[in-house]
């Protein structure tokens, strides 16, 4: 998937824009929420979501479990090498290195994310995908201290199940989310569309996320 590159070469604006567009196509919900983060934090969120995209799509691009495990190990090794000051020749790996070096992403959190997606892949059960951990990691990019971890753990599985059309359960009614973490979780509000079997159009998504950003109600 890629070899070592010069770790001193940062991604260009064009390369960052390409990753950003990739997330817009692959995960518009989270992408919309991330627009409300500050510029530096937004890049960290996009790097995080780009890793999640690479991990989530393993089940779609391999035909054998062993090949999937190789891909998960590739990303596990890529994060470990970043900790050692090296980086692989892959735009997402380079993005992760920049954000790890800046202190906005933590290698331990990324390893846990990889483990979670691998566990879901091996079990052939998407309900085990680490949606809550992904949201918690995103929230911690925005602020290291908040009192909404339990709420994120509670609501994330309902959002993801509804978005996959696996469940029509709305899940918990929550108190408003703290303002600093809203760009990490505002898209959870879209569950109200998904439980009704609706596919909101881009404008509906943006308005719903904006309401969540303003009110904290997801």
Predicted stretch roles:
Residues 2-76, 85-97, 110-113, 130-140, ...:
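Catalytic cores of Mg2+-dependent Asp-rich isoprenoid enzymes
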Residues 79:
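Acidic, metal/ion-handling microdomains and their immediate structural contexts
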Residues 93-127:
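Hydrophobic alpha-helical segments and helix pairs
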Residues 145-147:
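Membrane-interfacial hairpin junctions
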